[in-house]
Structure formats: structure tokens, C-alpha cells
Amino acid sequence: LRYPKGLLFEDFPTTYRLLLKANKVVFNGEQSYFYRLRSNSIERKAFSLQKLDSGLKLLEMIDRQKNILLPIIKSYNCRTVSFLFHLLFQMPKGYVYRKVFQEKIRKLRWSVLLDERARKKTRIACLISFMGFELVEKIFCKMKSINV
């Protein structure tokens, strides 16, 4: 099992496969894993063709491995929708792939909304998306600017 070379966000589709191969996985309530946020990190960089290309390739990988992820498909759908919103919020208005990402969110949002263990922020974004993706983006950008 290897992380794909040259892709951004490469841990997303691979970590789930790694967890499924483990004999035992332990969860605890402690926050023991931290991302180091650097000023030049992927998270802080503006939207680019490399981000889009990586995002599209990762979505292809996700679609190909859904059959092995059935035991955890709800959490995987939630993570996928979070990832799609993350990239969607960074895309320029009118960008051709916005519709592709929005359609993928539409296909998965009921799964996320009906999953009581799904991330609250993602469930809220899915709910608001029924009123339009522009509204979701406006609300979440406002929340981000006031650090909510």
C-alpha cells in the first residue's frame, strides 16, 4: 500500500485502505495528531490547476475503491463531501469543474445528512446546499472570517 506520488491530499483515499488492512484500530478521545499549518502549506495556497488535477484524480480513486469501503462507506462519504466543499470554496466563480463537484455533493449529501455520526459542519453544509451552493459558501466564508 503506497501513497500516490505527485498528488496533493494523497492521504485522503489511502488512509482508509490502510485502516481496513489493520488487525486492530483503537480510537481515543485525546487529540494526539496535529497538522502543522505553515504559511506555504497546501491548505493555505490559492486554488491552482495542480489542486484541481489532484482533486479530480483522487475522486477517480475514491470511485474505484467504493466496493472495498462498504463497511465504512458513511464516514467515507462524509469525508468525500468535506473534501469537495473544501475545493469548491477555493474555485473561482464560473469555473467549469464547479458543476462536477456540486453534482457529486448532491449525490452524497443525503448519506451525510442521515448519518448521525457525520461531522456536524459537513451535515450543516449539506443541509444548506439544498438552498444553493452560493449560500453555503457565503455562510462558511463568513464563519471562517470570524473564526467560528
Task: Identify the residue ranges that each predicted region occupies.
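Conserved nucleotide-sugar donor-binding catalytic segment
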Residues: 1-48
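Charge-rich, low-complexity amphipathic helices
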Residues: 18-19, 40-44, 55, 84, ...
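Active-site catalytic microenvironments for nucleophilic, acid-base chemistry
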Residues: 21, 87-90
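Catalytic core of nucleotide-sugar-dependent glycosyltransferases
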Residues: 30-39, 44-70, 95-112
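Structural motif
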Residues: 68-78, 116-123
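Amphipathic alpha-helical repeat scaffolds of TPR domains
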Residues: 75-87
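Membrane-interface aromatic/basic loop that binds lipid-linked glycans or pyrophosphate carriers
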Residues: 93-148
